[in-house]
């Protein structure tokens, strides 16, 4: 039997000589349950601009990266979460957190929180109780920033930085791993208390979070994919961050979402892609 790395239950960050503790996500926490409600995940594709958002405002909603800026124009009544999985977002769009984050449930990787400890220390101090750490199962540290070197996390990073092949988790009951996929192994988590599987887009992380929190159905908006060279709805041509989606679209993102849709449907949780741009790419939802 494989011995799996025990993920830390908390992470401590040294911010101006003050220890800030953030708990890891645990699906058994009562406040994490979505109580069998339908959940919308709103990504950042340009199609969001054509979305009738007024029809979605009362449904539990999980935002990712810059889509949280929608709360500046629309009154969402049930913000179920905000997910950031790549620290590069923090460095490229720091003003979004500063302007729109006011203590909503935030789920992010260690690398993201370490970036925030440097760029947004006041936010970390004020709202750390509303934050939860998510661990990528194959590299628990997460996607680090290219631009800055951070050293705020207090425990040693060596084990968490080690890349682990997904095939290592093939017999772990918390994951479904497809090792027959020709490009590279893909997978999906059934409970991200034990880690999430990456697929090249933060929306994939958010979908695993929604399932782990007992959503009845998962509705995806703004996952456009095919027009990834266009600015996100909150960007313009002058400030748009580079997108890696086109590079991994057919090899990783689409097969992973098809696996996720198939597995979650088999557990009674349908996944629906509402993007008019990418809907035709998927064969399971």
Residues of each region from the PLM?
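Metal-ion/cofactor- or nucleotide/acyl-coenzyme-handling active-site neighborhoods
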Residues: 1-285
């Amino acid at each position: 039997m494989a011995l799996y790395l025990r993920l830390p239950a908390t992470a401590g960050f040294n911010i101006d000589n003050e220890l800030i503790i953030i708990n890891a996500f645990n699906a058994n926490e009562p406040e994490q349950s979505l109580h069998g409600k339908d959940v919308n995940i709103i990504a950042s594709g340009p199609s969001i601009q054509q979305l009738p958002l007024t029809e979605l405002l009362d449904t539990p909603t999980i935002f990712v990266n810059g889509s949280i800026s929608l709360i500046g124009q629309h009154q969402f009544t049930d913000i179920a979460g905000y997910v950031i999985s790549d620290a590069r977002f923090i460095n490229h769009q720091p003003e979004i957190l500063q302007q729109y984050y006011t203590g909503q449930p935030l789920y992010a990787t260690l690398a993201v929180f370490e970036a925030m400890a440097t760029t947004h220390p006041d936010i970390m101090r004020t709202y750390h109780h509303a934050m939860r750490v998510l661990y990528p199962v194959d590299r628990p540290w997460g996607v680090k920033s290219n631009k800055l070197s951070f050293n705020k996390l207090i425990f040693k990073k060596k084990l968490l930085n080690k890349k682990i092949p997904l095939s290592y988790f093939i017999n772990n009951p918390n994951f479904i791993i497809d090792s027959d996929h020709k490009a590279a192994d893909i997978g999906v988590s059934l409970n991200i208390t034990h880690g999430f599987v990456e697929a090249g887009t933060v929306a994939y992380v958010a979908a695993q979070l929604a399932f782990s929190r007992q959503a009845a159905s998962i509705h995806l908006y703004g996952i456009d994919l095919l027009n990834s060279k266009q600015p996100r709805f909150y960007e313009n041509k002058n400030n748009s961050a580079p997108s890696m989606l086109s590079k991994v679209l057919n090899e990783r993102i689409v097969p992973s979402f098809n696996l996720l849709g198939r597995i979650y449907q088999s557990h009674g949780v349908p996944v629906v892609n509402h993007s008019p741009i990418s809907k035709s790419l998927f064969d399971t939802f």
